């Protein structure tokens, strides 16, 4: 289905390290660096799809009426979701929903990245979580 997706950013010196650090808690690591584009490619070793993040140009700049991205990254545990969110908050992300149970089978956290994209970490199970 998908091979990769890309995020072009206005401030790669902020956005690239932000993603590197936040996604590390989800097992997503840098597999390639492209200094000429101020870019990295990230991937989770057990998944084929890759994420490219790098410097944008005038053709990619957002304008009025352009919708930002919503990206959801799979987590393997509640603790990984918490670490993703805590790292983002420490790096200055804007909160868009703290870690918590959103549905009976999912634990999620949301934030806006430095470019204004809504990013999410989600841990899902087949059975409902016990409520306390």
Give each language-model segment a name:
Residues 55-61:
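Short beta-strand/turn micro-motifs at beta-sheet edges
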Residues 2-11, 62-132:
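Vicinal oxygen chelate
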Residues 45-49, 59, 77-79:
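Short, charged/polar surface micro-motifs in flexible loops or helix N-caps
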Residues 49-53, 121:
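Broad, structure-driven detector of short, well-ordered beta-strand segments within folded domains
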Residues 8-50:
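Core segments of cupin and vicinal oxygen chelate
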Residues 56, 74-76, 114, 124:
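Beta-hairpin (beta-strand-turn-beta-strand) motif
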